[in-house]
């Protein structure tokens, strides 16, 4: 029985997702429906958490909007998420970056990960 469920979930999962990790700055293109038309809205911020649960995977992106911290959680394989683009890789040593919630300004910066040769 569980093999059938796994097969169905595998069928629903997106295959074209880039590899990203906490600390990375990403741009998520979100499908927004306004009346009878649909458009794409870009949401750019730092990934502060990733939840890997197969089809139910999710990630949280934090950005500062008008001086106020805004977090949004996206379902990774949701049809609402059109695309994910990694802008820069961050060098962090934690899986969850919840400590960024209490920080602002220069203390909330994340070092950039240098590419391997």
From Swiss-Prot:
One of its GO terms (biological process) is translation. InterPro entries: Ribosomal_bL19 (IPR001857), Ribosomal_bL19_CS (IPR018257), Ribosomal_bL19_sf (IPR038657), Translation_prot_SH3-like_sf (IPR008991). Keywords: Ribonucleoprotein, Ribosomal protein. One of its GO terms (cellular component) is cytosolic large ribosomal subunit. Transmembrane segments: none annotated. One of its GO terms (molecular function) is structural constituent of ribosome. It comes from the Bacteria. The keyword Membrane does not apply. Coiled coil: none annotated. This protein is located at the 30S-50S ribosomal subunit interface and may play a role in the structure and function of the aminoacyl-tRNA binding site. Belongs to the bacterial ribosomal protein bL19 family. This is Large ribosomal subunit protein bL19. It comes from Vibrio vulnificus (strain CMCP6).
């Amino acid at each position: 029985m569980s093999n059938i469920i796994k097969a169905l979930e595998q069928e629903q999962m997106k295959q074209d997702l880039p590899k990203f990790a906490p600390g990375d700055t990403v741009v998520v293109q979100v499908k927004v429906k306004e009346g009878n038309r649909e458009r794409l809205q870009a949401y750019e911020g730092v990934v502060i958490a990733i939840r890997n649960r197969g089809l139910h995977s999710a990630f949280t992106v934090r950005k500062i909007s008008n001086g106020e911290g805004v977090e949004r959680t996206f379902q990774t394989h949701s049809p609402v998420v059109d695309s994910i683009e990694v802008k820069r890789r961050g060098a962090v040593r934690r899986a969850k970056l919840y400590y960024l919630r209490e920080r602002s300004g220069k203390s909330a910066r994340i070092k950039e990960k240098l590419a391997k040769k």
